Amino acid sequence: MKNKRSQNSPYVTPDNPYLTLEKALGYSFKDKRLLEQALTHKSCKLALNNERLEFLGDAVLGLVIGELLYHKFYQYDEGKLSKLRASIVSAHGFTKLAKAIALQDYLRVSSSEEISKGREKPSILSSAFEALMAGVYLEAGLAKVRKIIQNLLNRAYKRLDLEHLFMDYKTALQELTQAQFCVIPTYQLLQEKGPDHHKEFEMALYIQDKMYATAKGKSKKEAEQQCAYQALQKLKEAK
């Protein structure tokens, strides 16, 4: 006897190659062409790609994530909220959410991008995620996007707070520089001062022998994290 629930499921169709993706997302697209467009990188040279959807998705996600953080962290001031949002609304942040649904497995990229592992690049993967969320917004509205993002944040982050996200900046930067420049950042101690119980460390961060940031902290690790945050912002602005 067939399971009635699976029979009536919006995901179950004989010709749906995106079944697993839609299940992971928690949303079944009514128009599969819209879904395909969201997954199509411009390198494919097709009439429709995901650039316009990416533009819309960027605005939608900025609003949804900003709203979620506003309600969740009522004790944070504007500066802390901005820092939190910058961590999530970024190539690294969206790549993390995209990988939570294995989005990279469904991207449509050119053969040259395939050879260079383009589907794993944060720039391509994060853009596709923005486009995907724009597609959901166009079909189902803001409330559905909000629900999906809340679920993905819970899935992708063990703890969603400033301290936890801040400690991830070094990893985020290393992933980005490996993808863009095929190198990892290096850190150098510039100065150490103060008594043992109240030390202050100043670190510098270099990418391809170019200094990208300097920062101070109560430990080398803290200063390195602050350097990584600054470098991420610079690379984001340079795109």
From Swiss-Prot:
SUPFAM superfamilies: dsRNA-binding domain-like, RNase III domain-like. It catalyses: Endonucleolytic cleavage to 5'-phosphomonoester. PROSITE patterns: DS_RBD (PS50137), RNASE_3_1 (PS00517), RNASE_3_2 (PS50142). Residues 168-237 form the DRBM domain. One of its GO terms (molecular function) is metal ion binding. The active site is at D58, E130. Its cofactor is Mg(2+). Its EC number is 3.1.26.3. Homodimer. NCBIfam families: RNaseIII (TIGR02191). Digests double-stranded RNA. Involved in the processing of primary rRNA transcript to yield the immediate precursors to the large and small rRNAs (23S and 16S). Processes some mRNAs, and tRNAs when they are encoded in the rRNA operon. Processes pre-crRNA and tracrRNA of type II CRISPR loci if present in the organism. This is Ribonuclease 3. It comes from Helicobacter pylori (strain J99 / ATCC 700824) (Campylobacter pylori J99). The gene is rnc.
